[in-house]
Every structure is written in C-alpha cells, then in structure tokens.
C-alpha cells in the first residue's frame, strides 16, 4: 500500500507486478498519452511543424550514417560555418514509432539562436532490438563528428538531445563500453534528456515489452541508471509537470544519480506535458530553452545553470 500511496496510484486488486501495481496500472504509468486529451493532435502537429521546418530552412535530408535503411538523418546547417554548436535530436515514440518526418520541429528555434541541428532516424521495435537501436544512435554521432568539417559545425560542441525513448537512447550513448556501435562517450559536449526512462525493469514488465522483447538481463544492460560512469559531460534533465508518477520517479532517480557525476541542470516545466515539452527547445524565456542555450554557449540565456521550475517553460531550486 505504501508504494501505491507514494505514487499517487489507486490500490488495485490484481496481482502486483511492480512496486505494488498490477499490470493494468503499470501499463497506464508507462503510457504517457494517458495524461493528455489527444495524442493524435500532437502527432499531427509534429508532422506539420516538421514539414514547415524543412520548407523554410535549408536542409540536407536523408543522409546515410550507417548501412541499415533506417540509419538516416536530416542536417540543418547553422549560420556560423565551422564554429557553431550542433544539437543532435533523437525522437521518442516508445522505441516503436515516429521518425525524421515528425521530428524536425525543434530546428527553427535552435537555428535562429545560431546552432546547427541534426534529426536522427533509427530502427524501431519489433524489427530492431534495443541494443541495435542504441548502436545506431552512437553511429549517427560518430558519423557526424567525422564529417563535421564538411557539414560546418564545431565537433567539440556536439550536444545530444533525446525525448522520451530518445532520452533513454541519448543517455545510453553517454555510457562507455557499448554492446553495439562505436564508443562515443567521451566525444559529446553535453546532453539534454527530456521525459526519459532510465531503468527499464518496469518497462520490461509492461505492455511496451510486447514489442521490445527484453529479458531481465537485456533490461538491465540497457538501463543507464545501472551503468553510469564516474564522470559525464554536463546534462540538462527535464520533464513536464503533467507526467505520470512513474515518469516523474524515473526523472527524479536520474537527477539524483547524475548529481555526483557531472554539472546538472534540472528543469520542471509545470505547464508542459510529455509531448509538448520539446516545443521549448531553443526558445528563450522558457526554462528548458534557456538551459539548453546556456549549455550550448549561445547568446545571453537569461536563466543561470542550476535547478529550475517555471510555469510554461519551467524551473526552481
């Protein structure tokens, strides 16, 4: 009962599978769309805004960073050739949905502030396993760094950003000794983790694993919380105010684990949810936007580098 009360979840009569929750409750906790009126409305907005980004800004679309048909990225060049930072965006979708077509919407605000942007596509479950997905993200980073001069960004200013499942994959890319793909852990200037899952054991026990097919060992191997090294690059860890209790718990655990290892900026955007939080990337005057711009060394972002909570774009100590 104590775990359920701590989570703010109603006690249930079914067999408990994780922290006092039955399978149906756990499934709801790992279904972020349970907290919003319409997931489809967000997905349509992602697609519409991403199409506008490609229409209104120069882009090198469909660049192959690896041999798999899904290993493609779209590159939006920044204004300061050879010197600008790069934000690499890894989309969400529960490791089984979305792609480049819906994921360029953060680019315009970041481009306006002087960054280049790369939008990554990767293989999805059930066709591609989680180890291989993580390897693809690593290969994308490795490819971008090897082609930095040609693309026109500063390789020592590459920042990796992911949302939801993409936050998990971005966090995994920070870890040394990968199971798949090149080790790029020491080559990333900073990371931005939005509404992520960092311990996959509850995911393994939920409906999400119907596609992921993780066993206990695979869940642990792919859980960044269990493998964090002693030192990491600076990290912005953010979530919306309207997240499920389990997503909030995952966020809190990651923040606690990162504090002794790196400089961390925590952002809680009280009026944002799991799906609209990424809209604030690069947007001045929002907690997330200011934190990311400050970490990337762009402009005179108004928020200092520390913990933050605000209303629409959120932060506080």
Regions found by a protein language model. Give the residues of each.
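C-terminal catalytic histidine-bearing segment of alpha/beta-hydrolase fold enzymes
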Residues: 248, 252, 259-300, 311-317
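Short amphipathic alpha-helix adjacent to the substrate-entry channel of hydrolases
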Residues: 101-119
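N-terminal cap/lid segment of alpha/beta-hydrolase-fold proteins
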Residues: 29-81
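Short beta-strand element of the alpha/beta-hydrolase
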Residues: 83-93
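The feature captures the conserved acid-bearing segment of alpha/beta-hydrolase catalytic domains
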Residues: 184-185, 190, 196-204, 216-252
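Hydrophobic beta-strand anchors of alpha/beta hydrolase catalytic cores
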Residues: 87-89, 117, 235
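Primarily recognizes the serine-hydrolase "nucleophile elbow" in alpha/beta-hydrolase
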Residues: 139-207
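Alpha/beta-hydrolase
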Residues: 90, 194, 269-272
């Amino acid at each position: 009962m104590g775990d359920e009360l701590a989570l703010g979840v109603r006690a249930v009569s079914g067999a408990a599978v994780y922290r006092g929750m039955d399978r149906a409750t756990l499934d709801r906790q790992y279904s972020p769309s349970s907290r919003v009126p319409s997931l489809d409305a967000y997905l349509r907005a992602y697609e519409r805004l991403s199409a506008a980004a490609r229409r209104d800004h120069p882009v090198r679309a469909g660049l192959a960073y690896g041999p798999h048909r899904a290993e493609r990225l779209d590159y939006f060049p920044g204004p300061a050739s050879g010197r600008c930072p790069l934000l690499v965006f890894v989309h969400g979708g529960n490791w089984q949905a979305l792609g480049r077509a819906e994921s360029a919407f953060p680019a315009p605000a970041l481009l306006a502030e002087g960054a280049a942007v790369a939008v990554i596509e990767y293989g999805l479950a059930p066709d591609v396993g989680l180890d291989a997905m993580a390897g693809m993200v690593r290969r994308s980073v490795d490819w971008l760094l090897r082609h930095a001069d040609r693309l026109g960004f500063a390789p020592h200013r590459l920042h990796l950003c992911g949302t939801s499942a993409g936050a998990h994959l971005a966090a995994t890319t920070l870890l040394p000794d990968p199971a798949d793909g090149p080790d790029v852990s020491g080559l990333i200037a900073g990371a931005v983790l939005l509404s992520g899952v960092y311990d996959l054991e509850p995911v393994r026990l939920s409906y999400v694993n119907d596609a992921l097919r993780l066993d206990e060992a695979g869940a642990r191997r792919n859980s960044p919380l269990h493998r964090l090294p002693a030192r990491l690059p600076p990290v912005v860890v953010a979530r919306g105010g309207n997240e499920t209790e389990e997503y909030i718990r995952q966020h809190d655990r990651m923040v606690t684990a990162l504090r002794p290892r790196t400089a961390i900026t925590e952002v809680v955007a009280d009026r944002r949810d799991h799906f609209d939080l990424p809209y604030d990337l690069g947007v001045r005057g929002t907690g997330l936007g200011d934190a990311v711009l400050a970490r990337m060394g762009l402009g005179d972002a108004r928020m200092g580098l520390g913990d933050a909570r605000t209303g629409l774009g959120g932060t506080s100590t």
